[in-house]
């Protein structure tokens, strides 16, 4: 049987994403996710929090980094990677998750942030971005507007929420 290195996590961002560039010009997005775990200890429930460092390379990381805001719920898919280095004569190592896909599942306040098909993923964002602008997002907002609003308000991919007509619509149908 072949070895398997596959990780899937759902948690909340502990801080805003950090976007850096390598000397060769490659984008590197770093962020951390907290995952709560409840377990029974005798008659009581004990909550434990685990923290995981995540990296997302390339165009996907570059584009989605602006939406990775502290408190947002995300799903991360990737693999474990171990970095090793020497520091002051001591061998050091760190295990982090190298993400292949990141999906925004909810806002800081718990509402869903969705795009066309109900998901807002890093691979979809990278494919749909043109000239630094992400389809289905407002130019002045860090949250996706999505086609849920766009279809009902007459918005297209280059519109912002400021251009929408909210006067005669039932806003209770918006899922966030």
From Swiss-Prot:
Keywords (alphabetical) are: DNA-binding
**Keyword DNA-binding listed:** yes
PROSITE patterns, sorted: SSB (PS50935)
> Which biological process annotations from GO are given for this protein?
DNA replication
Classification via Pfam families: SSB (PF00436)
Q: Where is this region: Disordered?
A: 118-176
User: Any S-S bridges, and between which cysteines?
Assistant: none
What InterPro entries does this protein's entry cite?
NA-bd_OB-fold, Primosome_PriB/ssb, ssDNA-bd
Q: Which domain of life is it from?
A: Bacteria
Q: Which GO terms describe its cellular component?
A: nucleoid
Could you tell me one molecular function GO term of this UniProt entry? Answer: single-stranded DNA binding
Assembly:
Homotetramer.
* Name of this protein: Single-stranded DNA-binding protein
- Source species taxonomy: Bacteria, Pseudomonadati, Spirochaetota, Spirochaetia, Spirochaetales
């Amino acid at each position: 049987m072949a070895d398997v290195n596959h990780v899937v996590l759902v948690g909340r961002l502990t801080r805003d994403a950090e976007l850096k560039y390598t000397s060769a010009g490659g984008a590197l997005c770093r962020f951390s996710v907290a995952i709560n775990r409840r377990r029974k200890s005798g008659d009581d429930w004990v909550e434990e929090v685990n923290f995981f460092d995540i990296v997302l390379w390339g165009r996907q990381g570059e584009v989605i980094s602006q939406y990775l805001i502290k408190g947002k719920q995300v799903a991360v898919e990737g693999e474990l990677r171990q970095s090793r280095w020497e520091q002051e004569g001591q061998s050091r190592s760190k295990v982090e998750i190298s993400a292949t896909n990141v999906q925004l599942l909810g806002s800081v306040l718990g509402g869903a942030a969705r795009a066309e098909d109900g998901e807002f993923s890093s691979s979809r964002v990278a494919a749909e971005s043109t000239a630094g602008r992400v389809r289905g997002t407002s130019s002045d907002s860090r949250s996706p507007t999505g086609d849920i609003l766009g279809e009902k308000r007459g918005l297209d991919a280059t519109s912002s929420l400021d251009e929408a007509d909210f006067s005669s619509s039932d806003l209770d149908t918006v899922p966030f």
